[in-house]
Amino acid sequence: MLLSSLGEAVGLLVSGDTELLSITINSLNFAVSSTVLAALIGIPLGIVMAVRDFPCKRTVVSISHTLMGLPTVVVGLLVFSLLSRSGPFGGLGLLFSPPAVIIGQAVLALPIVISLVYGGLSRLDPELYETLVTLGASRFQRTLKIAREGRIAVASAVLTAFGRVVGEVGVAMMLGGNIRWYTRTITTAIALETARGAFTLSIALGIVLMVVAFGVNFGLNYLVKFRPGSGAV
Amino acid sequence: MRALYSQAAPALWVQGLRFSYPALNGARSQAAEPVVAIDDLQLGAGEIAVLIGENGSGKTTFLKILAGLLGPQSGQIEAALNGVPSVGGVRSAAPVLVHQKPYLFAESVFSNVAYPLRVRKVAREELRRRTLSALNTLGLQGLAGRWAPSLSGGEKQRVAIARALVLRPSILLLDEPSSNIDDGSVRTIERVLRELAESGVAVIMSTHNLASAYRLADRIVPMAAGRRIPLEVNVLRGTAIEAHDEHIGVFQTVQGLQIYCPAGNEGARTAVIRMDDIILSGEEITTSAQNRLQGNVTAVEGLGHDLFNVKLNCDGIVLRATVTQTSMEELAIRPGTMLHVTFKASAVKLY
């Protein structure tokens, strides 16, 4: 049965089935948007944590590290309670819409981006910061340069966060609701189709997801091996 | 040859400086001993001051304070900063520091050196011209396109100095610029620092390398435990000229006085005599020592532990000798006393 399904799945992939395409586009759209959102907030925060001293810094770092292991269903629950009709942001009517999934996945990705950017940049030479100060760079210019010097760490952080959100099912299910043509993602579709016994679409989607996941891992490996000199992490 | 002490307005003036590191646990440190305590240091435009001292003597910390990287608890630093424009008033300009192990950005040598101009939004043509000129000064013109992190230690040090020079600072700070680098780079750096000083830049550098310090310094600033300590040597400028005979050479000071020194050092520009090696006497004494001068005591300074530092004017050159309390009394040394000054040719070290 599995073999015949696999054959049909490949056929589905080759034929460019519109539902398969819609689900894949949704998944990538949510994952990319949430990763970009998390990167926009998380990269500057990670840099600030790496280059500046502030009260309770170690506590903040520990919390950020701990939150990397945040269970997806807990994030789903948390954001659900905020966005549900009776919640504080219920009036926005976002629940079971793409923005809800993106927000939830961004919450999931944020601690990963912050922690990995912080970890990578704090291993940069401390003299980088002093050099930038003595050469007269402004605070903003220093931040840009530090991110550039630690660009490999920053890119790894973003890719890791993307890998985490593209393959998660809890947030997408709880906040998106798995609505066909609207919020259905690869993971929620696989969960539903498999439960229904419809393996063909599940397997086709599984292949797509694995290609994406392997692609991200390949990119990470390439980055880690690519260390041009001492400026890289 | 430059004057030993410039008469111009000071380029840098440090007064009553006290710095201690904050306690690690964040608690207010209980009046910890300052790690740097410099009561007074003045440096004229075009002067080179060299900080010498052991590891942990506070040289690096002092340089970082002067560069504005560390904030002292008290004291004043006044610096003439006409060369370094600030960026949009975000941070007032300060002397530029070149670290002991400079951090080069992971990009080309040219981009590294151009960076300080780029952050100041200098126009492209001028940026290019000034960057290439700084690279030329350090003999790096052939390396402009190279990937900076792949350079050798000496090349990296030169790139870092070029990156500081591109700003045309009026005060340049260097932390151990000649440690762990090849002789060729050391010579290039020494030549560049000399040229910079001649163009009016005040240079403060720290070093372990005493020979380099004596060759370069207009002023040697010995440090220990974060404080200035008295210099224990006389440093004379001049030229080692033709040998007196095969064993003894002659060093002619810039003031015109000739002193005997070991032969075989023709071309040396600096003579160094330890203050301990100078014998003062009321009458001329007959010894093996070749250098017999006469000097007029101009100042006497207590060093503690019953030791005194006597400053004499010997035919235009200033020499300092260390004597004990007993000798002070026996020779009745006070300002104005005429004394015979004797030291061996072999006590004169040439650099």
Segments the model singles out, each with a brief description of its role:
Chain B
Residues Q255-E301, Q325-Y351:
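Glycine/charge-rich catalytic "coupling/switch" loops of P-loop NTPases
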Residues W147-L151, E155:
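Conserved ABC ATPase signature
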Residues E125-L143:
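Conserved ABC ATPase "signature" region
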